[in-house]
Amino acid sequence: MSERQVTRVSAVMKTEVIMVDGLTTVDEALRIMKKSGADALIVNKRHDDDEYGMLLLSHITKKVLAMNRAPQRMNVYEIMAKPVISVRPEMDIRYCARLFENFRLSFAPVINRDGEVIGIVSNYDIALHSMDNGE
């Protein structure tokens, strides 16, 4: 019986993470997302005892645009998800996929042992890797 090769989150995550402050306007966050092509932004901690937040395009469409609110007058902290479920770079992507399914996640920050964001992983990243590698 052959041993299955384990693929770690670190192998599929994106390391280009865009971080913003919670006081950033939603309008500015949209501009950043458009320019970078990002679907998610990580919101910085405000102090050591704080947690990271995350802003998704879906937050903007559901909580701002669909509610006919002005993105120029809203701050990211008003609509972001916080705290967010994070994953470790050493995690097997099969468990990451299960975590995403169990908690209905589409993105998660990847956080190292020092508590720093080192990447972001998405359902899309996991699915593409699995497709490319016949998993």
Question: Residue locations for each model-derived region?
Answer:
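Tandem CBS (Cystathionine beta-synthase) repeat/Bateman regulatory domains
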Residues: 1-135
